[in-house]
Amino acid sequence: MSVPLLKIGVVLSTMAMITNWMSQTLPSLVGLNTTRLSAASGGTLDRSTGVLPTNPEESWQVYSSAQDSEGRCICTVVAPQQTMCSRDARTKQLRQLLEKVQNMSQSIEVLDRRTQRDLQYVEKMENQMKGLESKFRQVEESHKQHLARQFKAIKAKMDELRPLIPVLEEYKADAKLVLQFKEEVQNLTSVLNELQEEIGAYDYDELQSRVSNLEERLRACMQKLACGKLTGISDPVTVKTSGSRFGSWMTDPLAPEGDNRVWYMDGYHNNRFVREYKSMVDFMNTDNFTSHRLPHPWSGTGQVVYNGSIYFNKFQSHIIIRFDLKTETILKTRSLDYAGYNNMYHYAWGGHSDIDLMVDENGLWAVYATNQNAGNIVISKLDPVSLQILQTWNTSYPKRSAGEAFIICGTLYVTNGYSGGTKVHYAYQTNASTYEYIDIPFQNKYSHISMLDYNPKDRALYAWNNGHQTLYNVTLFHVIRSDEL
């Protein structure tokens, strides 16, 4: 930055010197500083008065003067000589001087342009330096902020890890305890081996019997853990959107391992075709299915598939049919005496839903209503092979007021509606023949539920909601008493 500034200073001082020299020297070279004017002291002119230069060859001469009759002044002037040789040298000097001045002016212009260019360069460099300085400041501030953020993150991580210190201490203690248990088990194993050698075969069989008894008690405990009181229902998962507003879909809770077939029945009356999908994935993503034709049309949406057979209510009757899906033959038919049918005691949504068949951990059930029970819900436990009624419970809940119903672990749960806001608000326990009013939220996503059944294998509710096939997970509360083990 210092070199362009020195150039500017030199140019300015040079221009000042040239200006001073031209103001002092140039007039003397062209003869502008020797001109003198003289006048007579009196107010009148005479013949001997005039303005004369010192050298008669340099200027005009007043030769004589007089006054005419009218009072006008008449002067006789002698013109200078035509030869101007004495001026030629000065003219030549002036021309040379002018050329020098012009050359100097051109040099000054060139130098000025260079100076302006250097000045622009200096200004540009100055702006770049300012920008670079600003960037350095930003980088410095950003670095400080980044360090501060890293410090905060490390501090937060340390705050998170600090509570783990006592946990690690507990783990150390647990590790020591595990080692102690391992040593004790090894000692116990050696002791048992010694006892086995001493006891003999008969006592070993007795020990084996005790182990088998423990296994049976463990299985019973696991079975009891599978059942419980309903405490919550998850939000629905939409599996597929197909069919009309009414229908049913299901899987077989007693299907063997690897059998994941899905059964699909569209409509609620006067239809007899059942779709079979190979798996839930096929049901969700394709329309590849096998069609089964039932010998009679069904009524309502209360069908179930259980242990390879489909159970349904024959259209416009109170007859239940068990149909084998493999052989496509009727295995058993039975009439539910006094059960209402043909829209006599349907659910609140209608649709010939008089008889609703269900399954749970305990087997096959039928839910319906009779005149003898004043149109209130009746629960019957059925034999899945013979369809005989094993036991019946009469409730005080009106069938027409129920939106839908399902059974979990022998307890019938009833919803208060089928459209809009819905909840499970009534439960009847068949094992104690008691009921209670509950309040379990139930999200009715598509505002028209026409089928709701529990699958004990999946621990889930299957629903048909306004042409959408949905699933709900359930939460069960388990209470196991020590005397039941």
Swiss-Prot record:
The keyword Coiled coil applies. One of its GO terms (biological process) is positive regulation of apoptotic process. This is Noelin. Residues 1-24 form the signal peptide. Disulfide bonds join 227-409. Keywords: Cell projection, Coiled coil, Developmental protein, Disulfide bond, Endoplasmic reticulum, Glycoprotein, Secreted, Signal, Synapse. Its main location: secreted. Contributes to the regulation of axonal growth in the embryonic and adult central nervous system by inhibiting interactions between RTN4R and LINGO1. Inhibits RTN4R-mediated axon growth cone collapse. May play an important role in regulating the production of neural crest cells by the neural tube. May be required for normal responses to olfactory stimuli. PROSITE patterns: ER_TARGET, OLF.
